[in-house]
Amino acid sequence: MATGPRYLVAFRRRREGRTDYYQRTKLVVADAPRMVVRRTNRHIIVQLVTAEMEGDKTLVSANSAELEKYGYTGATANTPAAYLTGLLFAAKAKKAGQDSAILDIGLNRATPGARVFAALKGAVDGGLEIPYGESILPSEDRLKGEHIAAYNEKAGDIVKNVEQVAAAIKKELV
């Protein structure tokens, strides 16, 4: 296929569908640290990343698996876990001396109320300055896990658990 001087092969990460270089260029040119939110099937990962000539440098990282240390008993890939991971990320970023960032959701679809925006809400509630619009954030009921408790009797105490963990993380902010 790539035979001849007129054929241009796209970058490898673009061919694999792993990087949107148009979006990445806009984020890197902004010259501010990026709050990178990635979701997996089991966890939410939030990182503070700066772009350098040698490659991106991660300054601070928080993973939803760390929430167990604070007493969180729910699933680590849902909306309340994303919110709490954002809070934990803000606490770590504040300790590292960072107080602002811009959101990088990567190839995630920007659906209002999505888990990536729950992590954003957690980081903003934790004291980071990140530009955003109110219409994209999930409702308070979803951040606390009331939608989970409504259909699952076993998870009825998730609202209390989320509030306890949020209080424990906010203590760390002080």
From Swiss-Prot:
Swiss-Prot/TrEMBL GO biological process terms: ribosomal large subunit assembly; translation
Keyword set includes Ribonucleoprotein: yes
A GO molecular-function descriptor: structural constituent of ribosome
Cellular-component GO terms for this entry: cytosolic large ribosomal subunit
Pfam families, alphabetized: Ribosomal_L5e
Family: Belongs to the universal ribosomal protein uL18 family.
Subunit-level organization: Part of the 50S ribosomal subunit. Contacts the 5S and 23S rRNAs.
Known function: This is one of the proteins that bind and probably mediate the attachment of the 5S RNA into the large ribosomal subunit, where it forms part of the central protuberance.
Protein name: Large ribosomal subunit protein uL18
Organism name: Methanoregula boonei (strain DSM 21154 / JCM 14090 / 6A8)
